[in-house]
Regions:
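Bacterial N-terminal signal peptides that target proteins for export
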Residues: 2-11
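Bacterial N-terminal signal peptides
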Residues: 10-20
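N-terminal intrinsically disordered, low-complexity segments enriched in P/E/S/T
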Residues: 24-160
Length: 160
């Protein structure tokens, strides 16, 4: 058997083997715990895609322009998870943790943004999920207390 036939045979065996392997599980972007359905809800990109998406252009305290964010409303995420509580403890990849009143998510159109200026957010640029308040739509949101609630690299919400 010549070298070409051996390479073709190896490629065919590899393709058959790899084709029979189960697809890798989709990565979890956000985990909700506490007062949610069954005590734990893990959201993948497919879960986010199943919800209504919204766009929001607003200034931030960490950008030099007014970015346009795209994502899902925080209140829709809470509803999807069957959350019942008065606050969430938001936790980020960088170990930042802050308590946020759930009332914020009903009083304002707060986004769980996955895109900024049309580009998917990654952990290197505040993603994969960034809590974004509609700062320019409500004067009160310019207060530093709200700036502390803009959690980037969001990975978990504990509903209490």
């Amino acid at each position: 058997m010549n070298l070409q036939h051996r390479i073709a045979r190896i490629a065919l065996i590899a393709a058959l083997f790899l084709g029979s392997m189960p697809a890798a599980a989709e990565s979890v972007l956000l985990t909700l715990t506490g007062a949610v359905t069954d005590g734990r809800v893990e959201l993948t990109r497919a879960d986010f895609d199943a919800m209504d998406w919204h766009e929001l252009a607003t200034s931030t305290s960490v950008t030099d322009h007014q970015p346009e964010f795209r994502g899902v409303l925080m209140r829709d995420i809470l509803a999807h998870a069957g959350a019942e509580g008065s606050q969430v403890r938001a936790a980020a990849l960088n170990d930042y943790v802050v308590d946020i009143p759930i009332e914020d998510f009903y009083q304002f159109d707060v986004l769980a943004a996955l895109y900024m200026d049309g580009v998917p957010l990654t952990p290197r640029d505040k993603g994969p999920v960034w809590i974004v308040y509609p700062r320019d739509d409500h004067g009160v949101l310019a207060d530093i207390r709200y700036d502390m609630r803009w959690v980037w690299q969001l990975v978990a919400l504990h509903v209490q």
